[in-house]
Regions:
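Extended, low-polarity segments enriched in aliphatic/aromatic residues
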Residues: 21-296
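N-terminal export signals
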Residues: 4-21
């Protein structure tokens, strides 16, 4: 090899290295929708078409959709309907079910870790003013699961974090996140007091069950009747999760929520990858993720 050839090779090495580690890209579609009075299903269906269709992704498969129902139903912003502010809107939920069913999905399971309860998700939806029967009739095989506890399953599922985990080596979640072929994050576009913004990845922070990661989680066993949030465990690191889950890797590193929550989100994104992200930004709020944040 001549000196000139060697210099040319060295000059291109950084480019080759950068290309080797370039993250994968995915198609994105966006549409303007002035209000939920418009045909939300038509708008969403057109965006699916722009992505190349969803039939290959969902046909004859179980699809699990994580929605955003942050906070108790009785906490409202200026008395407005929850879907107009900080919840995923039920029309978006129904439109998603309809389109997945039309694309051939075998089972459509909507999940959320409902605040302060391990009871049926349908009850929380009814208390939120949602028409559960209408959602059930949007497509064949529609189900609901509250993933804040064990729910309808017989065991929890362990999701190991590949590579170098930030916070926990693995996360123990409701069975619904494992017993699925396709995982969808149906998020609400809004600010977040700690993370800045809530989108598809931050929505999945709510996968962690309060029965294990909650303030009133059992020490040795999960508390299947949780009534509190995850502040002490996930936000502040004041205690470890229930022994049903592995403890934090570096418990004395940082107890600031601004550090901890984004790193938990990053862990979960690789432990339970998202196949399809849908973000509901038709109507929302600014200043925080819900009415409990001052200034919202």
């Amino acid at each position: 090899m001549t000196r000139r050839e060697w210099l040319a090779l060295i000059a291109t090495a950084p480019l080759l290295k950068a290309a080797a580690y370039e993250p994968p890209t995915a198609p994105v579609a966006i549409a303007k929708c002035a209000s939920y009075d418009e045909d939300v299903a038509a708008k969403l269906g057109a965006m699916f078409d722009q992505l190349g269709g969803i039939e290959k992704l969902v046909r004859n498969k179980t699809v699990t959709i994580k929605i955003n129902m942050t906070g108790a139903p009785d906490l409202r912003v200026q008395g407005l309907a929850l879907g107009l502010t900080h919840y995923t809107h039920p029309k978006m939920v129904g439109a998603t079910a309809y389109l997945l069913g039309r694309a051939g999905a075998k089972r459509i399971r909507f999940v959320e870790s409902a605040w302060g309860t391990g009871g049926p998700l349908e009850d929380v939806m009814l208390n939120s003013g949602w028409n559960v029967r209408m959602l059930q009739s949007a497509a064949p095989g529609v189900e609901f699961e509250n993933t804040n506890a064990l729910g309808k399953g017989k065991r929890y599922s362990t999701f190991k974090v590949p590579g170098s985990p930030y916070m926990y080596p693995a996360y123990v979640l409701n069975h619904a996140y494992e017993e699925t072929d396709v995982f969808v994050s149906l998020a609400k576009l809004k600010n977040h007091a700690t993370c800045g913004v809530t989108l598809a990845m931050k929505n999945c922070f709510g996968m962690t069950p309060a029965s294990i990661y909650g303030d009133d989680a059992g020490v040795d066993e999960p508390n299947e009747k949780p009534t509190q949030g995850r502040g002490a465990v996930c936000h502040e690191g004041k205690r470890q999760p229930s022994k049903a889950a592995p403890p934090e890797l570096r418990p004395n590193t940082n107890h600031e929520a601004e550090y901890r929550i984004p790193h938990v989100v990053a862990d979960l994104a690789v432990a339970r990858p998202i196949h399809l992200a849908i973000i509901d930004g038709v109507e929302s709020i600014a200043g925080g993720e819900g009415p409990w944040i001052g200034g919202v």
